[in-house]
């Protein structure tokens, strides 16, 4: 039986046909891509995916995971998967899927989840299936699992414990309009500043705060200028494990089944890894005296202020049915 061999380099992808036929005895090779090194949670999730596919398929198959952005960045990975060349599987931010689905970035929006338990329930209940279906139809890229789990909090140059203290707080937010709208609704004064300028902006009192996951706070050393971490838990990341639909259609049925099963399980594994590492990093930074975690007492009240903005945003992008189900899930 002749099987497909996936192109293993960008140079080859540019000149080769979508696939080449291999010797009947040669096992299939699938290519993955990730921006990070082996220590990152995304790598660990994709390696688990490979391990599980081998387990469930039970036949010879090879995987090549291209690390450290050697095949570009996540935006390029998604484009390659849509085209059926160079990259067969990856973990990609929903923001890079917006060309094909207006609702895609919504699944990574702020104030969508009540807490980590609610986030996990939403993913386990497969409430994001309409978004996945739209992306599969329009981009021919399958969302076979959901990793992520980094919780974003506000790092500030002063303690912030409630809505009164957070009122008027000048905080850097991401460029997507929904971030400024929701933070304004919560009473803050959001400002869009380039990520690599946040440290100096806080140091020079242009802003008083920013928001990120523990890994970002650690890597950028934001704790040096903003050592107070308000535990707002305003966003919990979702990072889909993606698989090229064009590649998937060429696979034998038993391998397709293995890919689907492995994707779901690897996503759950990735969520556990990232959420636990998030906590470990916070504990380590706090123990070393780099930052202090500050409980935020008005988390529920803040979400109540933001919910109408999120509801309007969901309706605007055609995700109102999904939003209603997420809010209703207990």
Q: What are these language model-derived features?
A:
Residues 5-15, 23-118, 127-330:
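N-terminal secretory/targeting leader peptides
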